[in-house]
A protein has these predicted regions:
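Ligand-binding pocket segment of bilobal, Venus flytrap-like solute-binding proteins
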Residues: 206, 212-278
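Periplasmic solute-binding protein
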Residues: 118-129, 146-176, 201-205, 289-295
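Short, low-complexity disordered leader/linker segments with a strong preference
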Residues: 1-60
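Early extracytoplasmic/lumenal segment of secretory-pathway proteins
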Residues: 46-123, 374
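Mature extracytoplasmic/periplasmic domains
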Residues: 292-351
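A structural signal for short loop-to-beta-strand junctions that line the ligand-binding cleft
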Residues: 108-113, 131-163, 179, 189-192
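An extracytoplasmic/periplasmic, membrane-proximal ligand-sensing/linker region
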Residues: 215-218, 327-374
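Short beta-strand->loop
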Residues: 64-67, 149, 165-167, 187-211, ...
């Protein structure tokens, strides 16, 4: 019996460790001047003190969120202003929140679960803590490719993982694909954050899905050989390293560029002004896209209010407010995008089921360790 218990514990640890490492690594390179940060709150999700007591007759919706972007709170505030429904936020890592939802079961006060990465959203679904979102409005707002096949989670915003480059040292016509960064011509010029970062794990997971494990490994190995330095810091730090001439190109998420360009820190603005953004693989598989998303908690006690909040977040007004602050791409095509995103124009994206990012996460982590991507 003890052997079975230990085996189960080991399997559980192996399944959850990649996600925990990835999300925890997102804490690197944060900056208080930004409008949004990619990492989850480090506060314990088990602290009941984080949940305001409900007053008699008060309309509420309880949101368990692994995002702690300032713009999200503004979004919730606007929803409350328009509907009178108070939004209570409980923050933690995605893994903490999912485990809490499982542990509390029917007694859980959670109505919504919000996090980043399609693989993590599918992880929540696989753990049985979500239920289908039934709303014609949401179906109209969010295209099918940005929704779970059973509608247990939907995208609320997207972000592209692109190549950024030094405008004074690299011409955009020198760039083409992610695969090309493994070419010898980029020897000692590529900057990237750690393999423990979920964004990089999901990028590699997408290559495994689209190109096969063998090609994904060959690419990662070639990229490691071209590193300008040992991976360190967050996405902003890669841009700053380009400015410091530590390397010429880097892989980072688009929304960081928007945040840096609109930062209160003059140095961040200067760094962002001197890097170019390139959307790779336009003639092949497309640029890697990932999502921030929402799931409806299985035992939501304020289901109607939760659906109303999802409809607001994915509606034109909510999408405009969200993306103007986070510089993510809206999922609702009717939303007014920030001028910067409009300037970047339309681009081809990878066509894959976001659930595959989670399914291939373990292989991606093993592959990254194998090729020496620290």
């Amino acid at each position: 019996m003890r052997k079975k218990y230990m085996l189960g514990l080991m399997l559980f640890t192996m399944m959850t460790l990649p996600f925990m490492a990835g999300c925890g690594a997102n804490q690197a390179g944060t900056n208080n001047t930004s409008t949004a940060q990619p990492q989850a709150e480090t506060n314990s999700a088990g602290a009941k003190a984080t949940e305001p007591a409900k007053k008699d007759g008060e309309q509420v919706v309880n949101v368990f969120t692994a995002r702690h972007y300032d713009v999200d709170s503004k979004l919730f505030g606007e929803f409350t202003k328009q509907t009178g429904i108070k939004v209570n936020e409980v923050k933690g890592t995605a893994e903490e929140l999912v485990e809490r939802l499982k542990r509390e079961g029917e007694s859980s006060e959670a109505d919504l679960f919000i996090t980043v990465d399609g693989g993590v959203l599918n992880y929540a679904k696989q753990n049985g803590v979500l239920q289908p979102i039934q709303s014609a409005e949401v179906d109209k707002h969010v295209p099918q490719e940005l929704r779970d096949k059973d509608n247990e989670w939907i995208g609320m915003a997207t972000r592209a993982r692109v190549i950024v480059y030094a405008k004074d040292r690299v011409k955009p016509e020198q760039l083409s694909t992610y695969e090309d960064l493994a070419n010898d011509k980029w020897k000692g010029k590529v900057l990237v954050r750690s393999s423990s970062n979920l964004y990089n794990q999901s990028l590699v997971a997408s290559f495994i899905e689209l190109n096969g494990e063998q090609e994904a490994e060959a690419w990662a190995k070639g990229l490691v050989n071209n590193f300008a330095r040992k991976p360190e810091g967050g996405d902003r730090d890669q841009a700053k390293a380009i400015a410091a001439k530590a390397g010429d190109v880097a892989i980072m998420n688009t929304y960081y560029v928007g945040q840096m360009l609109h930062s209160k820190d003059a140095e961040e603005v200067k760094v962002a002004e001197n890097i170019g953004v390139f959307f790779p693989n336009q003639n092949t598989t497309g640029t890697h896209l990932n999502i921030s998303g929402i799931g409806l908690a299985k035992h939501a006690k304020h289901k109607e209010n939760a659906i109303k909040l999802i409809e607001f977040i994915t509606g034109k007004e909510g999408q405009t407010l969200l993306t103007q602050g986070s510089f993510e791409f809206p999922v609702n095509k009717e939303a007014d995008k920030p001028a910067l995103l409009t300037e970047w124009g339309e681009f081809k994206t990878q066509q894959l089921d976001f659930a595959k990012l989670g399914e291939h996460n373990k292989k991606a982590v093993e592959l990254l360790n194998k090729v020496g991507w620290k």
